[in-house]
């Protein structure tokens, strides 16, 4: 096995791990929704979509045989993470400023009309308000943790690409 193949395999393992972490985060959100009764708002659902897109694109990227196709799907992972940053950042802003509403009247029908909301309503249908504060986990709200995860994804994936390919 040459050096370039070894580096690409390391990238693929990282992407599989990233996909599993994203699916675990969705599972944690579902646990909090079903067991702890924390109803998801439109921005929470959009963050779940971003996590799902990151996981799907990461798994597809890990299965790609060539470097070019791997890079294409890694770019889609980063774009999905940027979408998650927008949703989570907006949610963090709303939680910091409770007088601001997330627009439940305007966002809820749009989010509820997305295909996965009809296929799997438990996970992707809006039930709550964005301004509802829930108990923090290790000092941060769920939206803040999601923002951290999305920022790390948006930074670490391109950094890994650069690191693995600069000498290849």
Curated annotation (Swiss-Prot):
It holds the Pfam family DsbB. It is a multi-pass membrane protein. Gene3D superfamilies: DsbB-like (1.20.1550.10). The chain crosses the membrane at residues 15-31, 50-65, 73-89, 145-163. InterPro entries: DiS_bond_form_DsbB/BdbC, Disulphide_bond_form_DsbB, DsbB, DsbB-like_sf. Residues 1-14, 66-72, 164-168 are cytoplasmic. It is found in: Cell inner membrane. One of its GO terms (molecular function) is electron transfer activity. Its main location: membrane. GO terms for biological process: protein folding. Belongs to the DsbB family. Required for disulfide bond formation in some periplasmic proteins. Acts by oxidizing the DsbA protein. This is Disulfide bond formation protein B 1.
